[in-house]
A protein has these predicted regions:
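N-terminal secretory signal peptides that target proteins for export/translocation
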Residues: 1-12
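C-terminal motif of bacterial Sec signal peptides marking the signal peptidase cleavage site
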Residues: 25-28
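Bacterial signal peptide processing site
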Residues: 30-33
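Post-signal peptide N-terminal segment of mature Sec-exported envelope proteins
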Residues: 38-59
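Short active-site neighborhood of thiol/selenol oxidoreductases, capturing the structured segment around
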Residues: 74-102
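Structural microenvironment flanking redox-active thiols in thiol-disulfide oxidoreductases
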Residues: 85, 96-136
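Short, internal strand/loop/helix patches
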Residues: 129-168
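A short, hydrophobic beta-strand/beta-hairpin element that forms part of a small beta-sheet core
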Residues: 165-182
C-alpha cells in the first residue's frame, strides 16, 4: 500500500528543505553583513582604523587598518612590476578563499607584490600582522554604504571596466600597472604573470 502525502505537506517539506539548504550555504562562507560592519568593531578596534592618503608603500605594516581609495591602489600597481590583489573577506570558508598570511607568503615566494584589501570590518581586526599594510575599501568616496555595491564599484573602477558584470573572483593580477585578469586562485593569478613553476605553500 502506497501512502500519498497531502500536497500541503509536500510543499511544507520542500520549503523546510530549501531553508536548510540555504542556511548551509550561508554558513559555509561567513561573508559579513549588508554594510561594512564598522559598528561591530569594539571602541579599541575602531581606533586602529585610519584614513590613508597617498603612497601605499609609505604605510606601516603594523596593526593599523588603512582605508584606501581606488587611485591609491592604481598608483601602487603602476609603481611595481607585478602585483596580485586579494579581495579579502575575513572569516570566509569558501574553497576560493585562502589564509591571508599564506597569500602574502606565496606572492613573495614568487617575486610578486601582494596587496590585501578587506571588504568587511567583521573579523578584519583579528588578522595577524602580515608584513605588509592591511587595507580596507573606503566606502565613502564610492557614495554607498552597501557592501556588495561598494565592492563592485571599487573593483570595476580599479580595472577600468565598463562591463555591467562585476568581477566574480577574488584575485586580481597587474603587470606594470596593466590589468591582466581576475582569477579564482592565487596560483592562477601568479601564472597569469608568466611566472614559471609557481611556488605553492
Amino acid at each position: 500500500m502506497t501512502l500519498k502525502m497531502p500536497k500541503n505537506n509536500c510543499f511544507k517539506t520542500k520549503l523546510i528543505l530549501s531553508a536548510l539548504a540555504f542556511t548551509a550555504l550561508i554558513s559555509s562562507c561567513t561573508i559579513g553583513g549588508l554594510t561594512s560592519d564598522y559598528n561591530k568593531l569594539t571602541a579599541k578596534e575602531k581606533q586602529r582604523v585610519v584614513k590613508s592618503f597617498g603612497d601605499i608603500d609609505q604605510l606601516k605594516a603594523d596593526n593599523t587598518i588603512y582605508l584606501v581609495e581606488v587611485q591609491q591602489v592604481k598608483d601602487y600597481c603602476n609603481k611595481h612590476q607585478q602585483v596580485v590583489i586579494y579581495d579579502y573577506t575575513p572569516n570566509c570558508g569558501s574553497s576560493a578563499c585562502m589564509q591571508v598570511n599564506d597569500f602574502v607568503d606565496m606572492c613573495k615566494a614568487n617575486g610578486t607584490n601582494p596587496l590585501v584589501i578587506g571588504n568587511s570590518f567583521w573579523g578584519l581586526a583579528d588578522t595577524r600582522k602580515l608584513g605588509i599594510p592591511l587595507l580596507m575599501i573606503d566606502p565613502q568616496p564610492l557614495g554607498t554604504k552597501w557592501r556588495s555595491r561598494y565592492i563592485r564599484l571599487f573593483f570595476k573602477e580599479l580595472i577600468d571596466s565598463n562591463s555591467p558584470n562585476p568581477p566574480e573572483e577574488l584575485y586580481f593580477s597587474f603587470q606594470n600597472g596593466k590589468y591582466i585578469g581576475n582569477f579564482r586562485s592565487c596560483k592562477e593569478a601568479l601564472q597569469a604573470l608568466n611566472i614559471k613553476d609557481v611556488k605553492t605553500l
